[in-house]
Structure formats: C-alpha cells, structure tokens
Amino acid sequence: MPLTVNCPICKAPVEWVPQSAFKPFCSERCKLIDLGDWASEKHVIPVKAEFDPEAFDEFDLDEGDFFKE
C-alpha cells in the first residue's frame, strides 16, 4: 500500500507514487496556490537579517585595511 500524505493546501489525500504528477499537492491548482504564496512572501525562509562584523574575524582582516589596495 503506497504512502498517503495530505495536500499542504486543501488537505486532500495524495498517494505518494510516481503517477502523482503534482505531489505533495493534489492538483496543479494547489501547486500554483503554493507558488503564489512563496512569490508574495507569505512563506519565507528565515535568515539572520543583521550584519555580523565578527564574520570578518575568520579571515583575519583589519577593517581599516579592508578597502586598501
């Protein structure tokens, strides 16, 4: 018996088999709704937004000499 998952959009059951063209979605409609949510930034991948000056420490660069040639 194949694995069955719920569509992330409408919660309809979807069989996880090669013939399921839109898995994990149940249809192209649900797939496009999810794509639209990503495009409109309803879904985002969290990132550290602030600059970390300590990131330069691993390169042993002095900030005063950073842009000198």
UniProtKB/Swiss-Prot annotation:
Co-factor remark: Binds 1 zinc ion.
Pfam families in UniProt: YacG
Q: Which cofactor does it need?
A: Zn(2+)
Mind listing the UniProt keywords for this protein, alphabetically?
Answer: Metal-binding, Zinc
- Which superkingdom, per the lineage? Bacteria
The terms under GO molecular function for this entry are: DNA topoisomerase type II (double strand cut, ATP-hydrolyzing) inhibitor activity; zinc ion binding
Q: Which PANTHER family match?
A: DNA GYRASE INHIBITOR YACG
Q: What family does this belong to?
A: Belongs to the DNA gyrase inhibitor YacG family.
HAMAP family of this UniProt entry?
DNA_gyrase_inhibitor_YacG
Q: What is this protein called?
A: DNA gyrase inhibitor YacG
Give the originating organism.
Shewanella baltica (strain OS185)
Give the gene name.
yacG
